[in-house]
């Protein structure tokens, strides 16, 4: 698996990119917070140097959760860790947290996500038109690096009917939900509902911001994440516990 680490802080943060991005989506925040955490930055399947599935079913959200678990087990079993997701990365985290026996994080950073992919319209078409929509959305979000359009299309076909609303109340970890007030991809109502559904979540709404808060609102997002990480104790006694 293609994983890069950055930073020197005592906490580890596993940061998950969105449906069209790569780990580069997180780089503006990572560069700002290099002193606050050691960042574990995987490229999920179909991106960067990670595997490219031959079977379209391997773009299911559960397989992305496999990638996340592999990154955690490779890089975080000896340290306190936080999970951070942007856009689809939030959905990957929510899917991962449904698992029994998986290492649990000390906290969650959930940016520009949704608790119900079935109620989003990231793409409206299929076939060749979906590929064109993916190219248009990539340009709109100003992604530094982008996933192959076929990988994006295959992923969307697998995940577009998913709904995590029913599992939120079972998530005990502290969380911060960061969302743009004018997000056209994951409307702010999704972020508010996500924060309300979790057991203990704070929320920070960025006035006038859209979907690309990591790159367009880096300073404000980084400030909120720093405050949240400061609230998570990187105690040497911490072990990633599993849910039995």
Regions found by a protein language model. Give the residues of each.
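Conserved HGGG/HGGXW glycine-rich cap/lid loop of the alpha/beta-hydrolase fold
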Residues: 2-55
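Hydrophobic, aromatic-rich cap/lid helix
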Residues: 140-166, 182
């Amino acid at each position: 698996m293609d994983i890069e680490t950055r930073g020197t802080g005592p906490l580890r943060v596993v940061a998950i990119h969105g449906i069209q991005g790569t780990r580069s989506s997180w780089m503006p925040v990572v560069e700002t917070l290099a002193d606050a955490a050691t960042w574990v930055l995987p490229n999920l399947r179909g991106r960067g140097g990670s595997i490219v599935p031959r079977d379209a079913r391997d773009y299911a959200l559960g397989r992305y959760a496999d990638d996340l678990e592999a990154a955690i087990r490779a890089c975080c079993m000896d340290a306190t860790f936080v999970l951070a997701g942007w856009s689809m990365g939030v959905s990957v985290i929510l899917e991962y947290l449904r698992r029994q026996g998986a290492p649990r994080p000390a906290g969650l950073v959930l940016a520009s996500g949704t608790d119900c992919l079935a109620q989003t319209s990231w793409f409206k078409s299929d076939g060749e038109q979906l590929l064109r929509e993916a190219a248009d959305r990539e340009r709109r979000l100003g992604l530094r690096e982008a996933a192959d359009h076929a990988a994006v299309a295959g992923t969307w076909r697998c995940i577009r009917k998913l709904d995590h609303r029913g599992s939120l109340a079972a998530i005990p970890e502290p969380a911060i939900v960061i969302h743009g007030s004018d997000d056209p991809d994951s409307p702010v109502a999704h972020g508010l509902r996500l924060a309300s559904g979790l057991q203990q979540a704070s929320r920070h709404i960025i006035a006038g911001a859209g979907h690309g808060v990591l790159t367009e609102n880096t300073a404000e997002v980084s400030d909120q994440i720093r405050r949240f990480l400061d609230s998570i104790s990187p105690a040497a006694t911490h072990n990633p516990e599993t849910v039995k």
